[in-house]
């Protein structure tokens, strides 16, 4: 059995990293087989890939992601410090997740001992065959731009990547402009 653990809340009075690490140790003692490390909570406004980890402004402009061109960039792999801290204290496999957008970073996370595995979510929405591409030699940045539009429409439209056509991007921009998407 695996568990996804929010190791840090980023909120006043919320879970501290030390408490998160202690929780991971307790889960291991209970017999958990692996722990995926995440952080943040919706109450703080921290919304996963919303900061657009690992995607340059140039790429945002090329992909017509106008709503994020001036967004403050966040380094790729935004939960790696939390993951590293848990990895240091547990023996069960640890899984890194959160804004991993280059094959080289994914490899360095494993080779560097930060985690035993990496977990991806949004990149598979854009590239369902991503693992096969990496096996065949794909290097560099994955096609997912971390725009988070797929997440923003969760429950409103079928799961899809919205960076496929200009029409989809215009629909997204209109929904944001008219307040139909927050």
List where the protein language model places each region.
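Flavin-dependent oxidoreductase catalytic cores
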Residues: 1-182
């Amino acid at each position: 059995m695996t568990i996804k653990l929010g190791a840090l809340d980023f909120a006043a009075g919320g879970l501290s990293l030390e408490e998160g690490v202690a929780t991971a140790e307790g889960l291991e003692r209970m017999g958990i087989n692996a722990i995926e490390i995440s952080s943040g909570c919706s109450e703080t406004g921290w919304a996963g890939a919303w900061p657009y980890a690992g995607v340059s402004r140039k790429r945002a402009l090329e992909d017509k992601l106008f709503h994020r061109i001036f967004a403050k960039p966040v380094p790729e792999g935004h939960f790696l410090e939390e993951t590293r801290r848990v990895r240091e204290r547990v023996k069960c496999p640890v899984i890194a997740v959160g804004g991993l957008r280059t094959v080289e970073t994914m490899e360095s996370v494993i080779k560097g001992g930060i985690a035993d595995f990496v977990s991806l979510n949004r990149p598979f929405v854009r590239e369902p065959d991503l693992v096969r591409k990496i096996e065949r030699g794909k290097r560099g940045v994955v096609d997912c731009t971390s725009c988070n539009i797929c997440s923003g429409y969760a429950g409103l439209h079928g799961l899809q990547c919205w960076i496929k056509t200009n029409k989809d991007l215009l629909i997204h921009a209109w929904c944001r402009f008219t307040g139909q998407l927050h």
